[in-house]
Amino acid sequence: MNTLVLKIDAILSKHLKKQLAPYTISSQNTYVAFAAKKNGVTVLLYKSGKLVLQGNGANALAQELNLPVAKTVFEASNNSQDIPIIGSDEVGNGSYFGGIAVVASFVDPKDHSFLKKLGVDDSKKLSDKTIQQIAPLLEKQIPHQSLLLSPKKYNELVGKSKPYNAISIKVALHNQAIFLLLQKGIQPKQIVIDAFTSQSNYEKHLKKEKNHFPDPLTFQEKAESHYLAVAVSSIIARNLFLDNLDQLGQDLGYQLPSGAGSASDKVASQLLAAYGMSSLEYSAKLHFANTHKAQALLTK
């Protein structure tokens, strides 16, 4: 996905709205004054006058609309790394045991040499041992904001008749991590989120959150493989998740597996037999199918 960001005046804004009137779409972002989608490209005009075009045909649409795309205008492709970027990623949402760790990190081009020397990459490609070695160095060097939602708190917030579902809770966590990082005075040229839902769905859930920021977002699938800032967040978040999983296991006297496979079913059934449902409320995400599978194992 390509992203174009530029500043336009009131006259050009009015002309743009007229040109794209047949392609208007709704946006839940309170900072967006006008939104449209044409030829697969999403166009967002912010109240500040910032215009964002997102999609593989962003350049072509900009030319069609006669937009002033100068050399100074930022153009980001999947592997663009030459600007200051905030990248956000989460770990733990697919694991029955453990909480959800969300991290937003700010990477400046001057950090690239340091990151490449460390061998920073998508945390999914790195061993847990390597992650546990690299993460403390990243935490010390790279401005970031970490959030950890414990399983106990997760179960209070997520589920039937609860305030959040599995998607909206991640929207809330990503938004808060980025918001808090921006509050530290960070000034990125781009904010990238590893896409876990569509932009429209993200903005729908975002509407009920208290904290907001005007900066436009880029949603990129497998962003940790394309942006160093997201890769950094992925590593720090993975380490935070692993530490939490280990601590929960120590508290209960069991080694808790990552993931949501049969190993999780087995350990969950053992916890149920030893301590009852309260142990899973403390250590696991109850709405996962593993809970019922663990209960079924007890009856065999």
From Swiss-Prot:
Its cofactor is Mn(2+); Mg(2+). Manganese or magnesium. Binds 1 divalent metal ion per monomer in the absence of substrate. May bind a second metal ion after substrate binding. One of its GO terms (molecular function) is magnesium ion binding. It is found in: Cytoplasm. It is an enzyme of class 3 (hydrolase). HAMAP family: RNase_HIII (MF_00053). This is Ribonuclease HIII. It comes from Streptococcus pyogenes serotype M3 (strain ATCC BAA-595 / MGAS315). The gene is rnhC.
